[in-house]
């Protein structure tokens, strides 16, 4: 991130822009207005985490399965997955899911529910996969009866939008210190904080809403870029090609022609 700002900067900037007194301290301030600004900043930061998959918050989760264990605890800072990033790196296949409750019960109780691909869902704060890893259904096992774990990988957005300025690799989802580094775009966050404060006071938010939306639209697309789109896409072929064959594990023959 190009602009590094802390909690005190965001609150101070918002208050000064609204014509309020400049605070000497923020998180530990006894002033009721400053306390409300910090509380609204926590709300605004949480909203912005959900509102857009910020590149600063994207993390990769590598999961190595265990014999007989179908469900695994999610990362402690998990907020939500990036869609279609779930992959079985052992077999080089994308995972199938997330499955609905109805599909999951069909997988567990149906007559024709098994297959080589791994299915998944998120339930009760855990990442659950089907089939359950075991020596029987692990297709990569070199020796019959030997368990070989699957290595699964996926990307998610962390809920922690603040970084401790004094402690390495320490992140928070709520303000704890004036010096906590804001990982979100500070100008969007400042505009949103002003809007939240005006809204909380029951005042007319028309101007601040316009300012926030304009700042959001102007800066959000610069966060990580975007691909170029064509107005004349090519239709995919119905014949055998790169779009409809597996990524690997297909028989290439023994080199002998018949």
Label each PLM-derived region with a short phrase.
Residues 1-258:
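Glycine-enriched, solvent-exposed interface loops adjoining structured elements
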């Amino acid at each position: 991130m190009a602009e590094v700002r802390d909690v005190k900067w965001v609150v101070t900037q918002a208050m000064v822009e609204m014509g309020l007194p400049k605070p000497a301290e923020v998180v530990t301030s006894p002033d009721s207005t400053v306390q409300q600004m910090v509380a609204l900043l926590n709300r605004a930061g949480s909203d912005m985490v959900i509102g857009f998959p910020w590149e600063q918050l994207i993390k990769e989760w590598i999961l190595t399965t265990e014999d007989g264990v179908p469900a695994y605890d999610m990362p402690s800072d998990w907020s939500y997955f990036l869609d279609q990033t779930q992959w079985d790196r052992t077999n080089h296949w994308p995972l199938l899911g997330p499955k609905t409750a109805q599909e999951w019960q069909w997988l567990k109780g149906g007559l024709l529910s098994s297959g080589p691909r791994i299915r998944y869902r998120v339930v009760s704060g855990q990442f659950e996969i089907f089939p359950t890893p075991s020596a029987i259904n692990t297709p990569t096992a070199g020796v019959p009866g030997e368990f070989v774990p699957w290595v699964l990988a996926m990307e998610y957005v962390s809920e922690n939008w603040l970084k401790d300025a004094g402690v390495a690799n320490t992140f928070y989802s709520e303000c704890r210190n004036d010096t906590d580094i804001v990982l979100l775009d500070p100008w969007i966050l400042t505009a949103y904080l002003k809007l939240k404060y005006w809204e909380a006071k029951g005042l007319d938010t028309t101007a601040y809403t316009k300012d926030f939306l304009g700042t959001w639209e102007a800066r959000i697309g610069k966060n990580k870029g975007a691909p170029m789109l064509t107005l004349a896409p090519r239709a995919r072929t119905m014949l055998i090609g790169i779009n409809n064959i597996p990524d690997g594990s297909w028989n290439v023959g023994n080199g002998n022609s018949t």
